[in-house]
């Protein structure tokens, strides 16, 4: 097999592992989201790293998603406006959760593949101290493969997988890249975006399915690029003004 074929094989293997081993976690997470949506709460979603943020973006303001999703996108976290040290800044997460209105009784979906940086760990700790519940999308294998003294780690040497109330494991190996090329020192082609996107969309699908089975009408977002889509969105979004920070 060439490198592209080996990459495809490795990625599909990870996806199969997620769907085989994470059904219980997905089920419990979906039930928790339904509970909070019944209480008319928004679901806070925070990707706490330069690429993990894409998992939160996948759930936010996108056709097929839910309207009451409060995407958390603070300055300095995405690869377009970040400094490598921003996600390692102790104390930043508390101010972020203040700004985005994470409160007692809420649920925070935290997405970070390595699960070790300061913003990730502080966000989990701070949310729980406020009385919120935390769903973590992360790789236990990656977290446990990072030595305690690695500079990227939170000073407390903690892992997201040990703090979250529900952990959905994305099963990404340490280092993220998965293809060996003869003669090249480092592996190439990162894997993590695929299982993270699979997890968040599977969680959305399961949540909506169960709501419908319970006779509830989930507020699913249609495409703004189809006739009437934008007009419908503007109407529904009024319900969440002030609670979904980045509505447009």
Which stretches of residues belong to each language-model region?
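Generic N-terminal amphipathic, Lys/Arg-enriched alpha-helix
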Residues: 1-20
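Glycine-rich phosphate-binding loops that contact phosphosugars or nucleotide phosphates
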Residues: 45-204
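Flexible, glycine/charged-enriched surface loops at secondary-structure junctions
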Residues: 21, 25-28, 43-45, 212-221
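Acidic, Ser/Thr-rich low-complexity intrinsically disordered segments
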Residues: 227-248
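Long amphipathic N-terminal alpha/beta scaffold segment
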Residues: 34-40, 49-53
